């Protein structure tokens, strides 16, 4: 079992509830599951434009699937590496991370994220994972000032990019625009890190680490991703590495399933882009089990497709290993979960297939662009006269931020990023369409 310091909460609690024998991480899971931010995921589409019927996944169903895969990974690692069972002592912890991992993502997917990042370009930027950290630690009203007040280890596990944005930002790589309609996502990629407004919580999370561990954990280097101008962090905690693998598997496999059912990805595209990788893999299991899996995936027999999806998920989950960094002192940082090389390559091929034929599909990009315009329009309107247009409770937060000399624009980003796709679209119509909405008496 890990040190008890990782079970501490930022705001001490002394709640004595009748016959409540839950562990700290079971309480964390309950707080996330019952939060308004989690419920809103049911109205945020996982992939814009695939919602033509009731089959498609939302961010909520995606998060549930990530949770199921994440606990499956932990279970098989516990059997494979009994010496590491102390690190895998709570399934509730991993469920918490997987359920919460998308909570901070704004309406309209990447389009909404880029739009908010642009509108916040002079006020600390915006990025979905940073917003998740902020919701859990400050915004969700489980407590007055400490958000959900989750355990320190839970907060460590949600840190996909453990460094303040200001330490990662590289200036001079952005293109100012004269009109919102000219905004290109490739020119305004978000800095992947924690908002500087939340450095106090970030410092608290990392408090138990030695100086050497903290310096290394928060270090960054130039990204290997083409055309990404900012620095990228290099390390994640053990729990975060499991959550991220579960997210990647769900994205690559389950989003692919949606695309196949909708007819967005075809059998010929599979044969061209994926089948050769499986057929010529250096791993015998991939060659034997996955070489002809496309036949089942694109079958009109529903049960055959589901069997193929299950085979893919099982293959990736059981190919995950624990690696030893050998440098970090803290076990939660020293050990990480990762995929065997051939399976990592196979998963990346599936992710690229989804990106190429689904995410980059012009019809889907048009919807993302439309969402981008909605978010920028809303932000511009609220920023022009916050005390006139914001809801009363958000006005109060904005005024308090102004009075304390804090970043009041962050309050606008908090409000808009919490909207669902439908609510944001409806609000945009109320503000900008010519039709009078006679909702007053």
Curated annotation (Swiss-Prot):
Name of the protein in its database record: Deoxyguanosinetriphosphate triphosphohydrolase-like protein
Family: Belongs to the dGTPase family. Type 2 subfamily.
Organism classification: Bacteria, Pseudomonadati, Pseudomonadota, Gammaproteobacteria, Alteromonadales
Domain of life per record: Bacteria
Biased composition (Basic and acidic residues): 7-27
Biological processes per GO annotation: dGTP catabolic process
GO molecular function term, any single one: dGTPase activity
SUPFAM superfamilies the UniProt entry points to: HD-domain/PDEase-like
HAMAP family per the UniProt record, alphabetical: dGTPase_type2
Region (Disordered): 1-27
Organism expressing this protein natively: Shewanella oneidensis (strain ATCC 700550 / JCM 31522 / CIP 106686 / LMG 19005 / NCIMB 14063 / MR-1)
């Amino acid at each position: 079992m890990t040190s008890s310091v990782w079970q501490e909460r930022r705001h001490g609690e002394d709640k004595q509830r009748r016959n409540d024998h839950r562990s700290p991480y079971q309480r964390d899971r309950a707080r996330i599951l019952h939060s308004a931010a989690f419920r809103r995921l049911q109205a945020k589409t996982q992939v814009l434009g695939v919602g033509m019927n009731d089959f498609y996944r939302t961010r909520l169903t995606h998060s549930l699937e990530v949770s199921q895969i994440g606990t499956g990974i932990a279970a098989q690692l516990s059997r494979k590496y009994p010496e590491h069972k102390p690190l895998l002592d709570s399934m509730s912890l991993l469920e918490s991370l997987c359920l919460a991992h998308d909570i901070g993502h704004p309406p309209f997917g990447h389009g909404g994220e880029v739009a908010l990042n642009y509108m916040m370009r002079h006020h600390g930027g915006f990025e979905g994972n940073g917003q998740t950290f902020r919701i859990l630690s400050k915004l969700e009203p489980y407590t007055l000032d400490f958000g959900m007040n989750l355990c320190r280890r839970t907060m460590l596990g949600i840190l996909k990019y453990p460094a303040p944005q200001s330490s990662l930002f590289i200036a001079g790589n952005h293109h100012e625009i004269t009109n919102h309609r000219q905004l290109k996502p490739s020119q305004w990629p978000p800095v992947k890190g924690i908002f500087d407004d939340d450095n106090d919580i970030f410092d608290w999370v990392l408090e138990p680490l030695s100086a050497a561990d903290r310096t290394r954990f928060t270090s960054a280097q130039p990204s290997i991703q083409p055309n990404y101008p900012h620095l990228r962090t290099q390390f994640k905690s053990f729990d975060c590495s499991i959550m991220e693998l579960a997210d990647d598997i769900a994205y690559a496999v389950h989003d692919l399933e949606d695309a196949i059912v909708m007819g967005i990805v075809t059998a010929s595209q599979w044969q061209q882009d994926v089948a050769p990788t499986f057929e010529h893999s250096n791993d015998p299991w991939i060659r034997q089990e996955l070489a002809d899996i496309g036949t089942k995936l694109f079958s009109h027999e529903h049960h055959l497709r589901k069997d193929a999806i299950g085979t893919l998920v099982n293959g990736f989950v059981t190919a995950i290993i624990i690696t030893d960094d050998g440098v970090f002192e803290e076990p939660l940082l020293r050990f990480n979960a990762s995929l065997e090389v051939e399976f990592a390559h196979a998963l990346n091929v599936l992710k690229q297939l989804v990106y190429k034929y689904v995410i980059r599909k012009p019809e889907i990009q048009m919807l993302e662009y439309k969402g981008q315009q909605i978010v920028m329009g809303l932000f511009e309107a609220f920023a022009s006269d916050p005390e006139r247009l914001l809801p009363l409770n958000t006005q109060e937060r904005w005024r308090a931020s102004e009075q304390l000399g804090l970043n009041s624009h962050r309050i606008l980003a908090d409000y808009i990023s919490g909207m669902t796709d439908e609510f944001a679209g409806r609000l945009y119509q109320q503000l900008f369409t010519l039709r009078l909405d006679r909702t007053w008496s």
